[in-house]
A protein has these predicted regions:
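ABC transporter nucleotide-binding domains
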Residues: 1-134
Length: 134
């Protein structure tokens, strides 16, 4: 079973005069322990897909079709549940590291801090977990 399964995900933005189709029929499967990177040109929909996965699409955008399953949980059927998993089980780092990451800390330190916060682990255990993606 996939840890994260995105099936036929489409995201639209309803503008005044037209509909902008930001992502269309996206299909992704991620197994437990895997890390996914979305790569593409500016404006290709990477951030839109990432935001849709963790249910952070702002108006006038909306997920127009498809599903995002985190284990057995369809996060768009019960959006309140994603709050429990966002940052703990699934998260994203946006393409501009200056606004997404703390430039004073290493990426490793930031991962360790996040793991410690969500899983209540010691620094050593959090470091081991961040290195081995478990």
């Amino acid at each position: 079973m996939s840890f994260l399964k995105i099936k036929d995900l489409s995201v639209d933005y309803q503008m005044r005069k037209e509909t902008v189709y930001a992502a269309k029929n996206v299909n992704i499967e991620v197994n437990k322990g895997e890390i996914l990177g979305l790569v593409g040109e500016s404006g290709s929909g990477k951030s839109t897909v990432g935001n849709a996965i963790i249910n952070l699409i702002d108006e006038p955008g909306k997920v127009s079709s498809g599903s995002v399953l985190l284990g057995n949980l369809n996060i768009h059927e019960d959006p309140k549940n994603i709050v429990k998993y966002r940052g703990k089980k699934v998260g994203l780092i946006f393409q501009d590291p200056q606004t997404s990451l703390n430039p004073i800390l290493t990426i490793g330190e930031q991962l360790i801090e996040t793991i410690q916060t969500h899983l209540k682990l010691t620094k050593e255990d959090a470091k081991e977990r961040s290195i081995n993606c478990r």
